[in-house]
Amino acid sequence: EKPIDPYSYDKGKFVDIRSAKQLRGWKVVDDWTPTVKGNTRKGFVHVPMLVTETAGSSLSFDFEGRAVGIFCAAGPQACILEYSVDGAPFKKLDTYTDWSRKLYIPWVYLFETELVPGHHNLRLRVAKGDKTGCQIRNFVVNE
């Protein structure tokens, strides 16, 4: 049975952070805890996280699907991410939320949601600015 909306998230899934390639300024921390003070949520502390605290940090992520994003802990240093799918011009997304000042809040950010089904490449980098932190728990993909 076909969904009413062809871009619904009925085939959404989490993808392991270790699927990222060409890590520049990013690293996987197997037992992550915040370096900047802030409250946390269960499932987003003492778990593996793909982290950076540096402007210009970049990575590449190959995936199969129609949508791509990240599930992150958007805390006090939550950055502006620049992203490109399949070599398109980079777009910006501010990951800082209304609650980020005191809390590493679990948040899903979708970068692209209506891609042609198939193989794609995400390029992600941290913009220059006052806030340069990013903690990714999972990539999210909708097949």
What do these predicted regions represent?
Residues 1-143:
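Conserved catalytic region of serine esterases and O-acyltransferases that act on ester linkages
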